[in-house]
């Protein structure tokens, strides 16, 4: 009987505390679907023996019960169980594989050697929303942890880096943590080399069969090893084809060049002198040439030809520009100084031939020499479009010069944002239409 009375007293005390605490935390009235308030009835636990015999404040799970019922901190905050401690020095001195730890730095537990003794205190952090579904494989993420989608925080100096990406984080390490930056770059190179090897094995099958030897061409000749000071006669080793324009071969001294082996080498006769200036400049070598001396001479001749073509184009551009300036000066009666150096935005020289028709202005724009029209954002593409719309003849000439120059400097590459020249009607040739009279 005494036990029952004690239980009744405890139940009465708990109901009083419940009636005082719950109304202050949870609202007792809730609106229903019709806009009327409905009163929440108090629960009656007198008939539950398990609740009376086991009180929540006497059990070990009371803090969890309190958090789940009132504060709901467990569902809002994430308390990480493992924290990175960058004050620990790694025994091996190298970073561990970042692919084993995932993308977020909060889940990375690698022992990273750091130049700054910095340990992370266990504090609750909000779990960010990751924008990408794939993991971030850059090892610099081990030095940062996310704050949100745009901000990350450095674990070494606690500075916030905006626009969270691997490039910005690597630049931060390069500027403020040089030793750690060297470790990150080394680990990144190693990771990329391993990743490239794995991908190549996945996409390409490695053949174990040896390579087939290259067959010896029937028209190849064996060149014996020659002393460096002896005179070399091409007629001893090469058969000259009879031709009306062919010139007898003359002996010439061989240059002292080291050979890779003492054995004789086989050289196929696959190269011939091209027709043109080369035959006139080096007639003593004959038509075919397969020696290293001939190859070096060919390269030098090509360089000379490229330089001569480039100089010729520059001279033509300079002459056209001077002629246009002189014509405009005579027409308007003003003197234009051609010796003044134009305003150069870039350190390198403007090489496009369209610059012969434009000059820079003081406000950063460009002015057409032909029509004095101002072109904003001066660049070769805008200049070409201006000539295409207003000066079709000059546009065709500039386009052909540009293609010719590109063939010399960059053979086989044609990169331009303007269309090829077509026939545009000039302003001088006004199209006349027949006039029909209405009777």
Curated annotation (Swiss-Prot):
Q: Which GO terms describe its biological process?
A: regulation of transcription by RNA polymerase II
The record, for PROSITE patterns, names: ZF_BED
Here the segments flagged for biased composition (Low complexity) are: 96-116
Q: Does the keyword Zinc apply?
A: yes
Query: What keywords would UniProt list here?
Result: Cuticle, Metal-binding, Repeat, Zinc, Zinc-finger
Describe, by residue range, where the zinc fingers (BED-type) fall in the chain. Answer: 135-184, 349-398
What GO cellular component entries does it have?
nucleus
* Disordered: annotated span: 93-116
- Which positions are annotated as binding Zn(2+) 2? 368, 371, 386, 391
Domain of life, source organism: Eukaryota
InterPro entries, sorted: Cuticle_assoc_protein, Znf_BED, Znf_C2H2_sf
Query: At which positions is Zn(2+) 1 bound?
Result: 154, 157, 172, 177
* Entry's Gene Ontology molecular function annotations: DNA binding; structural constituent of cuticle; zinc ion binding
Q: What does this protein do?
A: Involved in cuticle function and is essential for normal morphological development.
Q: Do you know which PANTHER family this protein is assigned to? A: BOUNDARY ELEMENT ASSOCIATED FACTOR, OS03G0264950 PROTEIN-RELATED
- What name does this protein carry? Protein dumpy-20
Which source organism does the UniProt entry give?
A: Caenorhabditis briggsae
């Amino acid at each position: 009987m005494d036990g029952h009375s004690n239980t009744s007293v405890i139940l009465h005390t708990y109901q009083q505390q419940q009636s005082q605490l719950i109304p202050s935390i949870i609202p007792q009235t809730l609106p229903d679907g019709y806009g009327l308030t409905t009163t929440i009835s108090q629960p009656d636990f007198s008939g539950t023996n398990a609740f009376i015999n086991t009180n929540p404040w006497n059990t070990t799970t009371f803090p969890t019960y309190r958090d789940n019922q009132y504060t709901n901190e467990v569902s809002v905050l994430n308390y990480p169980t493992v924290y990175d401690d960058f004050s620990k020095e790694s025994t091996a001195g190298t970073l561990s594989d970042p692919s084993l730890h995932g993308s977020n730095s909060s889940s990375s537990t690698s022992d990273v050697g750091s130049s700054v003794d910095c340990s992370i205190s266990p504090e609750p952090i909000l779990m960010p929303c990751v924008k990408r579904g794939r993991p971030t494989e850059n090892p610099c993420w081990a030095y940062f942890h996310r704050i949100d989608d745009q901000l990350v925080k450095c674990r070494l100096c606690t500075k916030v880096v905006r626009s969270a990406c691997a490039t910005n984080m690597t630049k931060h390490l390069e500027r403020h943590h040089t030793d750690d930056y060297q470790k990150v770059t080394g680990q990144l190179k190693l990771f990329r080399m391993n990743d490239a090897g794995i991908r190549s094995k996945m996409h390409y099958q490695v053949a174990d069969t040896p390579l087939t030897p290259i067959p010896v061409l029937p028209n190849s000749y064996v060149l014996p090893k020659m002393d460096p000071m002896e005179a070399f006669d091409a007629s001893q080793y090469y058969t000259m084809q009879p031709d009306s324009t062919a010139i007898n071969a003359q002996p010439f001294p061989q240059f002292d060049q080291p050979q890779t082996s003492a054995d004789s080498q086989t050289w196929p006769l696959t190269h011939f002198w091209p027709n043109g200036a080369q035959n006139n400049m080096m007639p003593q070598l004959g038509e075919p040439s397969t020696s290293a001396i001939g190859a070096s001479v060919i390269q030098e001749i090509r360089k000379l030809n490229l330089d001569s073509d480039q100089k010729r184009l520059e001279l033509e551009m300079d002459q056209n520009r001077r002629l246009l300036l002189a014509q405009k000066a005579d027409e308007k009666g003003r003197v234009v100084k051609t010796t003044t150096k134009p305003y150069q935005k870039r350190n390198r020289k403007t090489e496009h031939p369209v610059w012969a028709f434009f000059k820079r202005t003081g406000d950063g724009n460009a002015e057409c020499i032909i029509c004095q029209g101002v072109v904003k954002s001066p660049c070769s593409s805008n200049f070409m479009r201006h000539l295409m719309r207003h000066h079709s003849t000059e546009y065709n000439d500039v386009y052909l010069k540009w293609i010719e120059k590109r063939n010399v400097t960059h053979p086989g590459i044609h990169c331009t944002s303007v269309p090829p020249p077509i026939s545009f009607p000039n302003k001088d040739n006004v199209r006349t239409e027949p006039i029909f009279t209405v009777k």
